[in-house]
């Protein structure tokens, strides 16, 4: 790369902003030129950690855009604000890396795509699970034909709860007041485990299914009496070749990056010629094939630059003109969002729903 990419981080609703800014800070051809958030205290850690000058920190996002003139904006708003924030920032003529999920609804996702189409700039949706080595290895093995055609994906994932950790997975113990105040627990801001985690499973599921869409979806959520959002959901999607399941959970016994809980977090994938289990943060994937039905392990291959994290990958695509592919692409993420929207309606109406379009 010859160009130094100017990057701004706007809206710190999601603590993943710290992780993404660290990736930008560590990139040899990227420079953090500005950060913006209406609550200045939420920027303090980033300012201190990455040596951001006080003049580069703003409480007004438009001033940040006007004065720092970034090439790329990283956005981490609450889920319900993804479309609004894309429409606010896109007119600056910047590329946007949006932290997961895609959007609060399919309609919002289409608004985001339309806003970016007007500028001719790129939009990518980051899913942190896309950068887990076991999942990348599983996808490679599927593409190599090791287990034949994928017929089922089964996903169980989550954590102890969104307030039990911050940037860099630093553990915290949330107070009742923090829970009450957090957007994660507010329905009108896109909170709940379903909207937080189901898109992971469905979007990576699209990747594993090679772009196939289900025909219909049924979903059930828990209904905690003291909360306005769910902490657990189970979605079943019927494809032409079989059923796949996606289970989200806030309240796992342990966080998977510390100790894998039971059930384990990650995927089990069944194909016509074998199976793969690829769990979060593990060193190997486990495979069964016709010739070795007893199963064996394959080491998860390390990720290498420029394919080791979303900032590296997005800048590589922008630099080379290679299209954004896989879960970060709008095309794949939109199918994942179709399944999420259908699941939301199914849970609300308590019935099976044909895939929404």
Spans of model-derived segments:
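C-terminal helix-rich "cap/oligomerization" subdomain common to oxidoreductases
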Residues: 1-4, 9, 30, 72-74, ...
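Contiguous beta-strand/loop segments that form the cofactor/metal-binding neighborhood of enzyme cores
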Residues: 3, 196, 201-283, 311-323
């Amino acid at each position: 790369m010859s160009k130094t990419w100017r990057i701004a981080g706007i809206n710190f609703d999601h603590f993943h902003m710290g992780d993404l800014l660290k990736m930008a800070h560590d990139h040899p051809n990227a420079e953090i030129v500005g950060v913006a958030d209406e609550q200045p205290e939420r920027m303090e850690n980033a300012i201190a950690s990455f040596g951001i000058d006080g003049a580069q920190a703003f409480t007004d996002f438009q001033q940040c855009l006007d004065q720092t003139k970034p090439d790329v904006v990283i956005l981490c708003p609450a889920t319900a604000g993804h479309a609004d924030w894309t429409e606010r920032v896109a007119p600056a003529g910047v590329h946007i890396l949006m932290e997961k999920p895609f959007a609060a609804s399919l309609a919002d996702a289409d608004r985001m795509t339309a806003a970016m189409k007007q500028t001719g700039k790129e939009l990518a949706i980051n899913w942190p699970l896309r950068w887990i080595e076991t999942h990348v290895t599983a996808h490679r093995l599927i593409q190599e034909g090791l287990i034949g055609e994928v017929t089922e994906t089964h996903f169980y994932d989550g954590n102890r709860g969104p307030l039990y950790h911050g940037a860099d997975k630093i553990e915290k113990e949330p107070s009742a007041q923090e829970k009450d105040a957090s957007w994660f627990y507010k329905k009108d801001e896109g909170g709940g485990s379903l909207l937080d985690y189901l898109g992971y499973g469905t979007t990576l599921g699209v990747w594993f299914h090679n772009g196939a869409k289900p025909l219909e979806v049924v979903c059930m959520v828990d209904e905690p009496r003291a909360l306005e959002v769910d902490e657990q959901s189970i979605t079943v999607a019927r494809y032409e070749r079989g059923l796949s399941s996606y289970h989200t959970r806030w309240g796992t016994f342990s966080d998977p990056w510390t100790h894998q809980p039971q059930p384990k977090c990650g995927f089990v994938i069944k194909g016509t010629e074998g199976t793969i289990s690829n769990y979060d943060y593990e060193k190997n994937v486990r495979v069964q094939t016709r010739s070795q039905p007893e199963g064996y392990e394959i080491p998860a291959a390390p990720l290498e630059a420029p394919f080791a994290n979303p900032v590296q990958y997005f800048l590589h695509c922008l630099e080379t003109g290679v299209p954004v592919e896989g879960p970060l692409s709008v095309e794949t993420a939109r199918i994942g969002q179709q399944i999420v929207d259908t699941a939301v309606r199914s849970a609300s109406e308590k019935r099976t729903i044909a895939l929404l379009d």
